[in-house]
């Protein structure tokens, strides 16, 4: 995909809902853009389906659109250090212009490094690893410290793990985020967690961590749920149970004394504007189907004192079909659309059509 210096920037006049560019129409329902495609110069087209599904899902968020829009004055002077940002700009420029966006250049510049890093992964988890890797790179390229007196030693401060004063920890993480994490990724996708570790032999220890993506290990969660509630063995997991397993107290070995009765409790200190949930299925013993809602509230899992407004709605879902290919279902302008390879269709029975395949990634967006 060639980047033309004489861009027609009219598409940047689109409003935040991107309502004035339409390429698909069915029963008077319109969709603002076409599927991302991959040309045949990619050796294995099947491998590109999870990449295109992730990119298509990200493109549906207004924060990504506004970020790309803000780059229009910078893109002509982007250096080699911003290679991925530049390729994303080129790709999303075509997408937001109402054209077919070809991901070939993006994949050729990115895919080999990704495959090398994750060469031993389970292929069914590719969207999760790819998104995590992409977030890392975009964050690194977009990161701009706000404070000119930023102290880089904060990044490696041992007090992030060892300091036991909860409020000092919080202040340290706040400073860390403000000074070194000001990017499109940290501003919209970072979840900050508080971990309370309780051990019979050691003092309680509180520390923070942050993650782009919440990972639910469905096989383990179903095993825990079934052992705790044997009468539910024939029932699907639901998202509430997954959050309970993720945040609840699971016995593990204490890092300090080796006590096997240690329990770890996790709470959201800050929840992201866009909550990305990876559904990991190993399919060893438990084959896990998951029930999830289009609207969700995580108030029960927030740290005490946080404002009671964390209501999310399902914006996008990436799934794997019976042919081993990925597709994305995206909620746009009040309707659900399925993007699969070069095809775009509207979903009529959303509750059935979204749940009939194995979801791999769920994208929940915070309600205004």
Name each model feature, range by range:
Residues 2, 12, 21-368:
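UBL (ubiquitin/ubiquitin-like) substrate-recognition surfaces
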């Amino acid at each position: 995909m060639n980047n033309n210096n004489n861009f027609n920037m009219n598409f940047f006049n689109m409003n935040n809902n991107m309502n004035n560019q339409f390429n698909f129409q069915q029963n008077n329902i319109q969709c603002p853009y076409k599927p991302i495609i991959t040309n045949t110069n990619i050796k294995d087209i099947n491998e590109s389906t999870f990449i295109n599904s992730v990119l298509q899902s990200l493109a549906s968020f207004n924060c990504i659109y506004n970020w790309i829009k803000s780059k229009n004055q910078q893109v002509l002077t982007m250096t080699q250090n911003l290679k991925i940002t530049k390729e994303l700009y080129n790709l999303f420029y075509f997408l937001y212009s109402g054209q077919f966006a070809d991901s070939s250049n993006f994949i050729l510049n990115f895919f080999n490094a990704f495959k090398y890093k994750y060469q031993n992964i389970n292929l069914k988890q590719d969207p999760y690893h790819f998104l995590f890797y992409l977030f890392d790179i975009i964050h690194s390229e977009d990161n701009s410290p706000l404070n000119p007196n930023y102290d880089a030693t904060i990044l490696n401060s041992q007090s992030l793990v060892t300091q036991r004063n909860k409020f000092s920890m919080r202040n340290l993480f706040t400073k860390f985020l403000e000074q070194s994490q000001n990017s499109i990724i940290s501003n919209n996708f970072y979840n900050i967690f508080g971990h309370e570790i309780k051990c019979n032999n050691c003092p309680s220890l509180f520390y923070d961590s942050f993650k782009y993506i919440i990972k639910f290990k469905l096989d383990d969660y179903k095993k825990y749920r079934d052992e705790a509630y044997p009468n539910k063995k024939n029932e699907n997991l639901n998202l509430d149970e997954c959050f309970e397993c993720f945040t609840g107290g699971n016995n593990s070995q204490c890092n300090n004394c080796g006590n096997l009765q240690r329990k770890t409790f996790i709470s959201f200190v800050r929840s992201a504007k866009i909550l990305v949930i990876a559904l990991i299925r190993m399919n060893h013993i438990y084959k896990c189907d998951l029930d999830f809602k289009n609207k969700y509230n995580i108030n029960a899992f927030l740290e005490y004192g946080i404002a009671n407004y964390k209501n999310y709605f399902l914006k996008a879902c990436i799934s794997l079909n019976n042919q081993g290919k990925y597709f994305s279902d995206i909620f746009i302008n009040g309707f659900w659309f399925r993007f699969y390879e070069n095809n775009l269709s509207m979903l009529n029975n959303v509750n059935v059509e979204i749940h009939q395949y194995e979801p791999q990634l769920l994208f929940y967006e915070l309600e205004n």
